[in-house]
Amino acid sequence: MEDLDAYRAACANRIRRLERYKKARSFCSLETDEPTSSSPSLSSNSDVSQENGSSTFDMIREKMFSLMENDMTLLKQLLQLGDQISEIKKERLRRTMSQNSLEYDEEDEKEDKFDSGFSASMSAVTNLYVDDERPQFFSRQNSVLRIPIPPRSSNRFGPRRVIRRPSDILPRQQTNNIRTLHVNSDDSDSSSSGSKTHSPSSSVYNASTLILPSKTTKNRSSNSSIDSGIRDEQLTPSPTFESVVI
């Protein structure tokens, strides 16, 4: 709209200049004409020329006005076309953006889809055909990959006990064998004598053998840790063998 206003102002200035030129020309023609009564032909000729000049000026001014009006209409049409073009561009941009987003989503869906031929009933052995003539076999059961399983609360706090190493089991077996030998020797001595009285050494030894499990249970209850399941470093028999002696 500012351009249109500037164009209108320029056209108005041109019209004013033409009007000034017309007035100046009329004054110049009046000054040049000589007021003599003996030359009626010259006055008539000057009047005819003025009329012709005024008529031509009016025609030119009308043409200028018509041209200005045409220019104004053309400018309005250009502005309307510019607005329409900008709206069309915006709509096209929106459509292209929506189409691109839809295509991108479709590509993602295609990539995420699994092969329809896969099923859970397939065999565990798959054939991998390489450039070599002989096919290579791969089994999931004998694969190298092993996933570590963390300990569960049921494994840690349950009735199951931790398996000892062979080095920890052997000394315990030896102590059990020694205890059984001593008990058998005491039984043989008592049967041979046939009396209920026992020697002080054997009674002390039996007392020590009877008191020993209670000490071991106290040590285990005080020093052992429940969460870790690690046994004490002392070679003590398990509490399951307190009541049973072989």
Curated annotation (Swiss-Prot):
Record flagged with keyword Isomerase: no
UniProt keyword list: Glycoprotein
Ranges of compositional bias, category Polar residues: 172-183, 235-246
Biased segments, Low complexity type: 35-49, 190-203, 214-225
Ranges annotated as spanning the membrane: none
Keyword Ribosomal protein: no
Known glycosylation sites: 219
Region annotation (Disordered) ranges: 29-54, 93-114, 148-246
Protein name: Uncharacterized protein T25D10.4
